[in-house]
């Protein structure tokens, strides 16, 4: 009997037998991968990259941004919403967020009256950090010393706020696609009296791995990726940049120190210099991928501060996550909807393919290359 004449159960059994007989190729066949850091799975469906795109196309990014706009509340000398005037800063500038999500003096909600309606106190502070006085630059277009100043400021604010709060979250939302309406180069710093959900998952996962294997999870992971090489994007004397085996976003990367470091303030001067150079190279590659100012959300995760310092945090390894949404071009992004919201994360492009595309990109910014060409043409 031909398969077309078989009943549905026979056809399913035949299909499963064919699948088992085929040679698995991660670049061609769907599979799920485990994220040991955040204890979750991602569905990888590489064959979907062949499908035509008929979904939403984002508008082209604004080509020019004024270097200084007196009405921009992040510019030097500008007046912010609360009436305060920014100083004429020429480097980094840290100030209290005028519309904070966390405040230090919120009242205690008291005990919950039912286990299904738990409420706990949430206190903290929110700050904004400008990277540069000019609105028309981004981190990849800044100099290495300027980026080093940002890293020093990150370390300082982590130490300062960490003296009072166990979790200090540094994060940057770059581009309107990631909800950033102000093009001025800046990040945010939220410190809280509680560990957020993702920090709690990373705490549990790293503690469990350390208990079972006697070494930090991410330190061992970095060593393994250096041996395997296929997901590496950049390596330097002190840092590793890779597309994680379990990456969810198309060109997601993980930035890791080579040695065991728990928190940003622990980085040596040499490691900070190297980090500045590595960040510039990575973010230049991002911009060069689709020749656009590449949007992303990024942030640092390190061992909790305050009472959770010392030997109890030996399982932690400092790291930065970069989550860029672009998938096929400067105007086609990945959406986290439907299956991702109701079941689990899913991606099309494999992490290995993404790493290869980033790895081969030049480390000179396309804007600078274009300017050189224009200069040569008019010479």
From Swiss-Prot:
Sequence positions that bind Zn(2+) 2: 202, 301, 319, 321
Extent of Polar residues compositional bias: 1-15
Catalysed transformations (reactions): alpha-D-galactose 1-phosphate + UDP-alpha-D-glucose = alpha-D-glucose 1-phosphate + UDP-alpha-D-galactose
Pathway: Carbohydrate metabolism; galactose metabolism
Alphabetized InterPro entries for the sequence: GalP_UDPtransf1, GalP_UDPtransf1_His-AS, GalP_Utransf_C, GalP_Utransf_N, HIT-like_sf
GO MF: D-glucose binding; galactose binding; UDP-glucose:hexose-1-phosphate uridylyltransferase activity; zinc ion binding
Annotated catalytic residues: 186
PROSITE patterns named among the record's database cross-references: GAL_P_UDP_TRANSF_I
Residues that bind UDP-alpha-D-glucose: 81, 97-98, 173, 188, 334-337, 339-340
Record bears the keyword Transferase: yes
Any one Pfam family match given in the protein's UniProt record, by short name: GalP_UDP_transf
Keywords: Carbohydrate metabolism, Galactose metabolism, Metal-binding, Nucleotidyltransferase, Transferase, Zinc
Name of the top EC class for this enzyme: transferase
EC number, as in UniProt: 2.7.7.12
One Gene Ontology term from the biological process aspect of the record: galactose metabolic process
Record-listed Zn(2+) 1 binding positions: 75, 184
Cofactor binding note: Binds 2 zinc ions per subunit.
SUPFAM superfamilies reported for this sequence: HIT-like
Described purpose of this protein according to its UniProt entry: Plays an important role in galactose metabolism.
Family recorded in the similarity comment: Belongs to the galactose-1-phosphate uridylyltransferase type 1 family.
Complexes and interactors: Homodimer.
Name assigned to this protein: Galactose-1-phosphate uridylyltransferase
Originating species: Rattus norvegicus (Rat)
């Amino acid at each position: 009997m031909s398969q077309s004449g078989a009943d549905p159960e026979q056809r399913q059994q035949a299909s499963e037998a064919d699948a088992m007989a085929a040679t698995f190729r991660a670049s061609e066949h769907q599979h799920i991968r485990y994220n040991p850091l955040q204890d979750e799975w991602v569905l990888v469906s590489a064959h979907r990259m062949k499908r035509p795109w008929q979904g939403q196309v984002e508008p082209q990014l604004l080509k020019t941004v004024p270097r200084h706009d007196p009405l921009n509340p992040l510019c030097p000398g500008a007046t912010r919403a609360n009436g305060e005037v920014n100083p004429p800063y020429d480097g980094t500038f840290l100030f209290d967020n005028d519309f904070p999500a966390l405040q230090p003096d919120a009242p205690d909600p008291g005990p919950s009256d039912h286990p299904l309606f738990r409420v706990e106190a949430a206190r903290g502070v929110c700050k904004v950090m400008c990277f540069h006085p000019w609105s028309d630059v981004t981190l990849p277009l800044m100099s290495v010393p300027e980026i080093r100043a940002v890293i020093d400021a990150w370390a300082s604010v982590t130490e300062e706020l960490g003296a009072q709060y166990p979790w200090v979250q540094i994060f940057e939302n770059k581009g309107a696609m990631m909800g950033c309406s102000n093009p001025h180069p800046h990040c945010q710093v939220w410190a809280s009296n509680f560990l957020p959900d993702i920090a709690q998952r990373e705490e549990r996962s790293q503690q469990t791995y350390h208990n079972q294997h006697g070494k930090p999870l991410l330190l061992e992971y970095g060593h393994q990726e250096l041996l395997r090489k296929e997901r590496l994007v950049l390596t330097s004397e002190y840092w590793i940049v890779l597309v994680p085996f379990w990456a969810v976003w198309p060109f997601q990367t993980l930035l890791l120190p080579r040695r065991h470091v728990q928190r940003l303030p622990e980085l040596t001067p040499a490691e900070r210099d190297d980090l500045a150079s590595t960040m510039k190279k990575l973010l230049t590659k991002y911009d060069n991928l689709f020749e656009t100012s590449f949007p992303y959300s990024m942030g640092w995760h390190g061992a909790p501060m305050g009472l959770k310092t010392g030997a109890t945090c030996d399982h932690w390894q400092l790291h930065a996550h970069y989550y860029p949404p672009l998938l096929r071009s400067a105007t086609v992004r990945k959406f986290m909807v439907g299956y991702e919201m109701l079941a689990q994360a899913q991606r099309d492009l494999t992490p290995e393919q993404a790493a290869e595309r980033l790895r081969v990109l030049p480390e000179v910014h396309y804007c600078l290359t274009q300017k050189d060409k224009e200069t040569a043409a008019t010479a």
